[in-house]
C-alpha cells in the first residue's frame, strides 16, 4: 500500500510541475512583443468585424508569428551604424517638417526631439535576429554613397547658381540697353516734332495739311496768251493761219501726225 501511495504522489507532483511549466511558458509568450502584436491583430480582426466593407479594406491585418525562446537567445543588439543611419534619417525628416511654414514650431520641434530620443533609446535596447541584419551591414557604404550624392547635388546646384547669375547679368545689361534705346527714341521723336513745326512755319502748312500758297495777282490772270503774243508779231496773221490749216489737213501732214502718234504709243508701251 505504501508503494502505491508513493507512486501516486510522484505522478501528482509531475503533473503539477508540467502544469506550472506550461503556465510559465504561456505567460512568457503573452508578455513577448510578438504575442502583443498577435493580440493587437485579434483586436483589429474583432474590430474589423464591426466595420463596413470599405473600412475593412483599410484595416491592416497583422499576422501572429510564434518564435521560440531558443531562437530569441541568439538575437543580437541593433548595430551602431544602423542606429546612426536611423538617427540621420530622423534628423532629415524633422528638418523637412520644420522647414515648412507651420505654427508653433518650437513646440513641434520639442515634441519631435522627444520622440526621436525615445525611439533611439528603444533601438539601443532592441534585439533583432542576426539573419535579418544582412541588408543592414552595408549601412556605412550606403551613407558614403548618399554623402557623395549630396556633394554632387551641391556642386550641380552651385553650377546652376552660376548660370542663373550670368543670366541675371545679361538680362540686366539688356534692360539697360533697352532703356538707353528708349531715351534715344524719345530724343529723336522730339527732334522730328521740332523739324515738323519748322517745316510748317516755312511752308505755311495749316492744321489741315493744306499748303498755303500765295494768291495769284489779277494781272497774271489778265495777261495775254503766248500764241496771241506771237501772232501779234506776224504782219499777215490770216494768211499764215490758212497755210497752217492746209498743211495740217494735207496727206503728208496727216501721215506725219500719225507717225508721231504711233511713236508716242510705242514709247509708252516700252
Swiss-Prot record:
One of its GO terms (cellular component) is inner kinetochore. Residues 143-205 form a coiled coil. The modification Phosphoserine is found at residue 52. InterPro entries: CAD_CENP-Q. It is found in: Nucleus; Chromosome, Centromere. Its main location: nucleus. The keyword Phosphoprotein applies. It comes from the Eukaryota. Residues 1-59 are annotated as: Disordered. Phosphorylation at Ser-52 is essential for CENPE recruitment to kinetochores and orderly chromosome congression. Residues 7-20, 39-48 have a biased composition (Basic residues). Pfam families: CENP-Q (PF13094). The keyword Nucleotide-binding does not apply. One of its GO terms (biological process) is metaphase chromosome alignment. Keywords: Centromere, Chromosome, Coiled coil, Nucleus, Phosphoprotein. Belongs to the CENP-Q/OKP1 family. Component of the CENPA-CAD (nucleosome distal) complex, a complex recruited to centromeres which is involved in assembly of kinetochore proteins, mitotic progression and chromosome segregation. May be involved in incorporation of newly synthesized CENPA into centromeres via its interaction with the CENPA-NAC complex. Plays an important role in chromosome congression and in the recruitment of CENP-O complex (which comprises CENPO, CENPP, CENPQ and CENPU), CENPE and PLK1 to the kinetochores. Component of the CENPA-CAD complex, composed of CENPI, CENPK, CENPL, CENPO, CENPP, CENPQ, CENPR and CENPS. The CENPA-CAD complex interacts with the CENPA-NAC complex, at least composed of CENPA, CENPC, CENPH, CENPM, CENPN, CENPT and CENPU. This is Centromere protein Q. It comes from Rattus norvegicus. The lineage of its organism: Eukaryota, Metazoa, Chordata, Craniata, Vertebrata. The gene is Cenpq.
Amino acid at each position: 500500500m505504501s508503494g502505491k501511495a508513493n507512486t501516486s504522489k510522484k505522478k501528482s507532483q509531475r503533473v503539477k510541475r508540467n502544469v506550472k511549466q506550461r503556465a510559465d511558458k504561456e505567460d512568457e509568450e503573452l508578455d513577448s512583443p510578438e504575442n502583443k502584436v498577435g493580440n493587437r491583430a485579434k483586436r483589429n480582426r474583432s474590430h474589423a468585424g464591426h466595420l463596413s466593407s470599405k473600412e475593412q479594406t483599410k484595416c491592416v491585418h497583422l499576422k501572429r508569428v510564434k518564435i521560440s525562446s531558443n531562437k530569441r537567445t541568439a538575437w543580437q543588439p541593433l548595430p551602431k551604424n544602423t542606429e546612426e543611419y536611423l538617427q540621420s534619417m530622423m534628423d532629415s525628416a524633422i528638418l523637412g517638417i520644420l522647414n515648412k511654414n507651420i505654427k508653433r514650431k518650437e513646440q513641434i520641434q520639442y515634441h519631435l526631439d522627444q520622440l526621436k530620443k525615445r525611439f533611439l533609446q528603444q533601438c539601443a535596447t532592441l534585439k533583432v535576429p542576426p539573419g535579418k541584419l544582412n541588408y543592414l551591414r552595408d549601412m556605412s557604404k550606403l551613407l558614403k554613397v548618399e554623402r557623395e550624392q549630396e556633394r554632387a547635388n551641391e556642386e550641380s546646384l552651385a553650377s546652376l547658381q552660376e548660370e542663373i547669375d550670368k543670366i541675371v547679368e545679361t538680362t540686366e545689361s539688356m534692360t539697360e540697353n533697352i532703356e538707353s534705346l528708349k531715351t534715344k527714341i524719345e530724343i529723336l521723336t522730339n527732334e522730328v516734332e521740332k523739324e515738323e513745326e519748322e517745316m510748317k512755319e516755312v511752308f505755311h502748312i495749316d492744321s489741315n495739311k493744306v499748303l498755303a500758297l500765295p494768291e495769284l495777282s489779277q494781272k497774271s490772270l489778265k495777261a495775254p496768251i503766248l500764241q496771241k503774243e506771237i501772232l501779234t508779231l506776224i504782219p499777215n496773221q490770216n494768211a499764215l493761219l490758212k497755210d497752217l490749216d492746209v498743211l495740217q489737213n494735207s496727206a503728208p501732214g496727216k501721215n506725219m501726225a500719225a507717225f508721231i502718234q504711233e511713236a508716242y504709243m510705242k514709247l509708252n508701251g516700252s
